Amino acid sequence: MSTASPLPCLAIAGPTASGKTAAALALARLLAERGQAAEIISVDSALVYRGMDIGTAKPTPEELAACPHHLIDIRDPLQAYSAAEFVQDTQRLAAEIRARGALPLLVGGTMLYFKALQDGIDDMPAADPAVRERLDAQAAQIGWPAMHALLAQVDPATAARLAPADSQRIQRALEVWHVSGKPLSSFHTRSGKNAEQGLVSPGGFFSLEPQDRAWLHARIAQRFDAMLDAGFIDEVLQLRARGDLHLDLPSIRCVGYRQAWESLDGLYSMNSLRERGIAATRQLAKRQITWLRSMPARHAIACDTPDAQQQLLQAAMAVVAAATQARNG
């Protein structure tokens, strides 16, 4: 195979605990055996944060060493990282990776990032710390359900799709309204913006989806138990010891961290942490699968079958071979 990258990139998406990391590393190894280097671009809004390793199931040092990874450990937990920043970073990284003669692999489960990369996004107002501080103070007085009701008055379309307790997204929607005077729902994705750039090759978007939800639920429970055994609570305690992090930050709202933080705050018992963490992770997986099924161009692979990884490898290599043949004429 030519050392020049024969296609822009492949993507491996899927809900949490579906086997994305293992599949991506197996594909990278197979490509290397065929003479084609590959580099992984993480599509995960939690992996960007430093010091949040156990609760995000961050790739191990051995896995990170097996293949170059990007967009991991690029932000302090105090900082935000937007979908717009992800799109800009990924487009830049993909170009740099191709220039090195390597093949970019987009791997992760943050579906908003995938959709933003696929459709493009309108230029929304930047975060305004002063506005956020006022909104946080108001929420502390009246609660997020009441803030949700306020959002419904100025942006009913966005309020209708958000749960009253979804503080992070309610805050962002109200922030956009206060900064721009326009509802968040007026900032639409621009379908096809990136189509001509061909960032993901036709046929190259692979989705690991379970046929049996019980299989995924069992893996989620096993993963959460493994996190607890690996010292997840100690990791959260270290974050709390900094003194500058709190529940209103996107980093601490990540699934698992939020539940642990609330338990340590005394809002819930520590005995209920496992049950609440697993339930929240199941809900995340359900939302991820719903997003995936709205993406018609995906190549879905049943991740709960014994040969799921082999199916993905065969399909991915077929896309690479077809692209190589087309390039070589």
Swiss-Prot record:
Binding site for substrate: 16-21
Family under the similarity heading: Belongs to the IPP transferase family.
Enzyme Commission numbers on file: 2.5.1.75
Protein name: tRNA dimethylallyltransferase
Record InterPro entries: Dimethylallyltransferase (IPR039657), IPT (IPR018022), P-loop_NTPase (IPR027417)
Catalyzed chemical reaction(s): adenosine(37) in tRNA + dimethylallyl diphosphate = N(6)-dimethylallyladenosine(37) in tRNA + diphosphate
Cofactor(s) needed for function: Mg(2+)
Domain of life: Bacteria
Any one GO molecular-function label of the UniProt entry: ATP binding
Keywords on record: ATP-binding, Magnesium, Nucleotide-binding, Transferase, tRNA processing
Function per UniProt: Catalyzes the transfer of a dimethylallyl group onto the adenine at position 37 in tRNAs that read codons beginning with uridine, leading to the formation of N6-(dimethylallyl)adenosine (i(6)A).
Keyword NADP listed: no
GO BP annotation list: tRNA modification
Chain residue ranges for the region called Interaction with substrate tRNA: 44-47, 168-172, 253-258, 286-293
Residue sites binding ATP per the record: 14-21
